[in-house]
Amino acid sequence: EILIGLVGSEMCIRDRFTQEAEFARNVIVCDGAYEPEKFYAIAKGLEKEPERGRRCYKCYELRLEETARYAKEHGFDIFTTTLSISPHKNAAWLNEIGERMAEKYGVAYLYSDFKKKNGYAHSIELSREYHLYRQDYCGCIYSRLEREEQKKNKRI
């Protein structure tokens, strides 16, 4: 059985993913609480950091700790993150944090770098096949604003 947990307490778009993820059999979608104050607390002072910067590291810590805690509380044997499929995410950081949280909570962490072996391209194909929503920013407001600025500058 697979559980998909939406852990990004700061995610701007949640409902669409939750509805679309219900497509798969044997997949349970667990929508974590929307608690943006947790994200804003760890992002304080890092608002101007670019994607892949220190703000992202702190966000990875927040997400993976919440995931590991949930896994422990609900009797899961292992946890991981799909964030490593993105070419914009630092898989080394994700895995280092995941291993640390595994040790802290006593739940195994599945090392991941899903973008390898054409994983990112395959994810795009699967998204098309299953008509899944794909956004072009990580989900936090700062990343969204950065992406909007990049798009605006490309039009000029």
Label every PLM stretch briefly:
Residues 95-156:
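Auxiliary Fe-S-binding modules of radical SAM enzymes
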